[in-house]
Amino acid sequence: MYPVDLHMHTVASTHAYSTLSDYIAQAKQKGIKLFAITDHGPDMEDAPHHWHFINMRIWPRVVDGVGILRGIEANIKNVDGEIDCSGKMFDSLDLIIAGFHEPVFAPHDKATNTQAMIATIASGNVHIISHPGNPKYEIDVKAVAEAAAKHQVALEINNSSFLHSRKGSEDNCRAVAAAVRDAGGWVALGSDSHAAFTMGEFEECLKILDAVDFPPERILNVSPRRLLNFLESRGMAPIAEFADL
């Protein structure tokens, strides 16, 4: 098991079922050292208000030896790469994930989907692209992976895509992983938990990575320090409370 999980949702996204405290308890039980809460951006119908993200600044950084990153799974809104995260939200957040969600950006043709994703990557506002292997959104995988490597944005392999949602993602995710490997980019693993019980579960992701001989040194979840070094290389100030994770 990797000790870092970068994608999960709380009851603030009302189709999810666990609280921050639930995730902390599960992290302690499973040996997770660092995790990110990434509730859906406010343009989703049942997402939290933007104040929810701004007020994450009141959270403790570490509880019982478990580090907590303040994050969002923002929505890609258009071909210009605009996302539903702005202003004071950026000031309060450590981790910005962004991806396609049908209520905000309906599936388009391959060229349009690719343009929107690459524009988001190039914007400098995003650390990780969520579930880029979604079969409903055809993309130019090679072009996206090369853009992500150039701009130091990780592409996610999402465990939930193989179990609960986005059925038919396997072939696309293998292609994404292979393209990131060839481009020298980063992969992020996400449980995409909507209930704390699945936190830290990456078994299906690892099957995808093993199938393409993906180099472990390019997986962000291997250690808290690797993930924090990545975020700091993207401009995040070092967080003193995380020094001993």
From Swiss-Prot:
InterPro entries: Phosphatase_YcdX_put, PHP_dom, PHP_phosphatase, Pol/His_phosphatase_N, Pol/histidinol_Pase-like
Binding site for Zn(2+) 1: H7, H9, E73, D192
Cofactor comment: Binds 3 Zn(2+) ions per subunit.
Class of enzymatic activity (EC top level): hydrolase
Listed Gene3D superfamilies: Metal-dependent hydrolases
Keyword Transferase found: no
GO biological process, one term: bacterial-type flagellum-dependent swarming motility
Needed co-factor(s): Zn(2+)
GO molecular function: phosphatase activity; zinc ion binding
Gene Ontology cellular-component terms listed: cytosol
Pfam family, one: PHP
Residues involved in Zn(2+) 2 binding: H15, H40, H194
Protein family: Belongs to the PHP family.
Protein name (record): Probable phosphatase YcdX
Gene: ycdX
